[in-house]
Amino acid sequence: MEIINKFLDLEALLSPTVYEKLKNFDEEKLKRLIQKIREFKKYNNAFILLDEKFLDIFLQKDLDEIINEYKDFDFIFYYTGEEEKEKPKEVKKEIKKETEEKIEKEKIEFVKKEEKEQFIKKSDEDVEEKLKQLISKEEKKEDFDAERAKRYEHITKIKESVNSRIKWIAKDIDAVIEIYEDSDVSGKSTCTGTIEDFVKYFRDRFERLKVFIERKAQRKGYPLKDIKKMKGQKDIFVVGIVSDVDSTRNGNLIVRIEDTEDEATLILPKEKIEAGKIPDDILLDEVIGAIGTVSKSGSSIYVDEIIRPALPPKEPKRIDEEIYMAFLSDIHVGSKEFLHKEFEKFIRFLNGDVDNELEEKVVSRLKYICIAGDLVDGVGVYPGQEEDLYEVDIIEQYREIAMYLDQIPEHISIIISPGNHDAVRPAEPQPKLPEKITKLFNRDNIYFVGNPCTLNIHGFDTLLYHGRSFDDLVGQIRAASYENPVTIMKELIKRRLLCPTYGGRCPIAPEHKDYLVIDRDIDILHTGHIHINGYGIYRGVVMVNSGTFQEQTDFQKRMGISPTPAIVPIINMAKVGEKGHYLEWDRGVLEVRY
């Protein structure tokens, strides 16, 4: 105990092995060791755990050599894997205080011998317990680092492990990618959360969607402030943003709308709703047009028709070159449920590990991969998440996914937007991943964009959106379901809005421009988030929800959600809408679906 206290005075703890060795030191040798540590502490005042490694260093090396090599050494990080911040300092003070109290009690002369022995025994046990805990944490860190290094070494050898003689046709085709910067909030965020921000946000949404509605109606809408003067008039057309939705006892739907100057009440008759002439799935904050008859009092409009700013119907986009695009999302590297074997198998497929002519043809012509968010599982996304992680360092999570993507053939261009598990703000629109993350990816042909973002990829206007608003829409619209993602995606296309309602489960940042409005007549809408694959074509727009590489989580079990992991959608960009244009790589097998 006396030896332990001498080192505690220096703010140094002894590992059990070192403690046993020091008990065999003669007094002079022990004194020299203590003096050398005391001199070293003048240059590095960190709390020291004297394990066998550092005991040998202090015994065998000159003091000047130790100071030069270890004066800036982060001992806290060496022991725990964490930087020395405020908490370790508090822990250091706490241990020092406890130690001083123990020593002071030990020096009290009137304590009875039996009590003193009992106290010493208990103190010895306490110190030993602290030592065991520190040693255990140190050993766990060493095991953890070794496991990580082994994992990284394996990932870096995926590409070279594939012996392929495929002729890479896509390698000779130039990538054509244009990012529509006006669709990406990255570097352009203006909101500070003021009332003025909210006013500008909703005004921008209203004005931009009003243009599409008036274009569809082929006429201008009346200002709502004029409706009161139009008592009894028919065929009156108005446009507004929905501020309230309610129903009457007899089943009519009451919808309040606003424009920039006034508000009005729309009455959607029950019989027209039941006949399918007008919809009943009106959402708060969406922008709609209405045609109807003004009441005799001028207080409301009886609606005959609802006009939404939906994308116009068209033929699906096709190009002349037969090349392929694959869609990923929700990879969730870092989660214990991450399907690393299946993900590795997919990367091997991309490198030419194929079993038949169809697979060889597709992989030889695959030119693009879009990733719609949640590359990693993140840290602190939900309470208790650390229990679900095999990698608790978010930088290392990104380093790992970067290493995986680096194993993909160089001629394949990769586009990445973030999701709610990624290291960006949770509120949408989300900026692209920060530089401290993107610098981990060692590829020239990788494009980082925000969420949402629209790009032109080889002639296809492609909108990437992670899909967090799906959690709100499923509860708001009867026709929308998790099991069939395209039922949700259709609702976005109808409204030209990726997240219609403010204040739901999907947080929205009130930018002065609403980046969640779908400005362009897109060719592809790519989403993720709900971990269930879905595919369809609506109004000529290819709708792809790209599933996941994460096994079913406990949360999904509680919610009754059954994911479809390790399925990768792939489209033939020359045959969209035709037989054989849509394929799925399903856990190692490529099959034509449509």
Curated annotation (Swiss-Prot):
Belongs to the DNA polymerase delta/II small subunit family. Possesses two activities: a DNA synthesis (polymerase) and an exonucleolytic activity that degrades single-stranded DNA in the 3' to 5' direction. Has a template-primer preference which is characteristic of a replicative DNA polymerase. Pfam families: Metallophos (PF00149). Heterodimer of a large subunit and a small subunit. It comes from Methanocaldococcus jannaschii (strain ATCC 43067 / DSM 2661 / JAL-1 / JCM 10045 / NBRC 100440) (Methanococcus jannaschii). It catalyses: DNA(n) + a 2'-deoxyribonucleoside 5'-triphosphate = DNA(n+1) + diphosphate; Exonucleolytic cleavage in the 3'- to 5'-direction to yield nucleoside 5'-phosphates. NCBIfam families: PRK04036.1-3 (NF003118), PRK04036.1-4 (NF003119). GO terms for biological process: DNA catabolic process; DNA strand elongation involved in DNA replication. One of its GO terms (molecular function) is single-stranded DNA 3'-5' DNA exonuclease activity. InterPro entries: Calcineurin-like_PHP_ApaH, DNA_pol_delta/II_ssu, Metallo-depent_PP-like, Pol2_small_arc. Keywords: DNA replication, DNA-binding, DNA-directed DNA polymerase, Exonuclease, Hydrolase, Multifunctional enzyme, Nuclease, Nucleotidyltransferase, Transferase. This is DNA polymerase II small subunit. Its EC number is 2.7.7.7, 3.1.11.1. One of its GO terms (cellular component) is DNA polymerase complex. It comes from the Archaea.
